[in-house]
Amino acid sequence: MDSLHIGSYSFSSRLILGTGKFSNSKVMLEAIRASGSQLVTVALRRFNREQAEDDLFGPLSALEAVTLMPNTSGASTAAEAIRAAHIARQLSGSPFIKVEIHPNPQHLMPDPIETFEAAKVLVNDGFLVMPYIAADPVLAKRLEEIGCASVMPLGSAIGSGQGLSTFEMLKIIIRESTIPVIVDAGLRSPSEAAHAMEMGCSAVLVNSAIAAAGNPPAMAEAFSEAVIAGRKAFQAGLMEQSGEAVATSPLTFLGA
C-alpha cells in the first residue's frame, strides 16, 4: 500500500487510532500494536504525569514508530483550542494538532466558525493543523486554502456508530481537496472503513469501534486489513454502476 503523506511526514498505515474509551492503557497499547497505526491522537487532558491512571503520554511514548497527534477535545472556543494546542506541543513535542471544538456536549458537533478561527492562528504558529469538521465542502476548501495539513470530516456523530451518513458530502470534499481527507467519527465496522477508503479517503480515524469492541486488539487488526483492502480497491478502480442488468455471458445458445 502506498504511504500517507501529511506535511513532510509519511506513514505506511492509513489507519489512525483514537486513545479514549479503552478500559485501560494495556488494552489500548495492544490495540495500537495490532492495528499497525503510526499516528494516534490523544486529548491534552490525558497528558497527566501527576496521576498515572489518567496519563496516556507515558505509555504512548514507549511505542516505537508511533507519532502523537494531540487534540483539543474539551475546547468550546477558538481561544481555548489555541491555548490547548500550545500546551500540547510543549508536552509532546509533536507538530501535529487535531483541532476539535464542540461547544454542545449533547450532540458534540464541531463549531465551524471557532474551528476556522483556531486553524488560522495555529497554521501561522507552525502547527500541522488537522481540523475535525462537519462534512461541509465549503468549509473544507476554506481550511485547505489557509494552509491546513488535512481536513477531518465526520462520517456521523462522534461515538454514534451510524457509519457514513455524510457519504454524498464526503464525495464532494474528496473530489475538491488537494490535501488528505481523513474520515473521523461514527464508523462502527471494518466494512465502513473499507467503504470510506474505496471512495478515495486518504485515511480513517477510529476509536469507539475498536475500544468498545469485545476484543479491541482483534477489532483493530480487522480495521487495519479493511483499510488496506479499501485503499487497494480505490487504486485498482471500481467498476461503473449501472441502473440495468448487464450480461456477463452471451445470451444466445451455441448454434442458435
Swiss-Prot record:
Database matches in Gene3D superfamilies: Aldolase class I (3.20.20.70)
One GO BP: thiamine diphosphate biosynthetic process
Catalyzed chemical reaction(s): [ThiS sulfur-carrier protein]-C-terminal-Gly-aminoethanethioate + 2-iminoacetate + 1-deoxy-D-xylulose 5-phosphate = [ThiS sulfur-carrier protein]-C-terminal Gly-Gly + 2-[(2R,5Z)-2-carboxy-4-methylthiazol-5(2H)-ylidene]ethyl phosphate + 2 H2O + H(+)
Claim: Flavoprotein is one of the keywords in the record: no
Residues at the catalytic site: K98 (schiff-base intermediate with dxp)
Coarse class of the protein's main subcellular location: cytoplasm
InterPro entries linked: Aldolase_TIM, Thiazole_synthase_ThiG, ThiG
GO cellular component terms listed in the entry, alphabetical order: cytoplasm
TM stretches of this protein: none
Pfam families given in the database record: ThiG (PF05690)
Pathway info: Cofactor biosynthesis; thiamine diphosphate biosynthesis
One Gene Ontology MF term: thiazole synthase activity
Binding site for 1-deoxy-D-xylulose 5-phosphate: G159, A185, G186, N207, S208
Keyword Transferase among record annotations: yes
Keywords for the protein's UniProt record, in alphabetical order: Cytoplasm, Schiff base, Thiamine biosynthesis, Transferase
Localization per record: Cytoplasm
Entry EC no(s): 2.8.1.10
Family of the protein in this entry: Belongs to the ThiG family.
Biological role: Catalyzes the rearrangement of 1-deoxy-D-xylulose 5-phosphate (DXP) to produce the thiazole phosphate moiety of thiamine. Sulfur is provided by the thiocarboxylate moiety of the carrier protein ThiS. In vitro, sulfur can be provided by H(2)S.
Protein name listed in UniProt: Thiazole synthase
Gene responsible for this protein: thiG
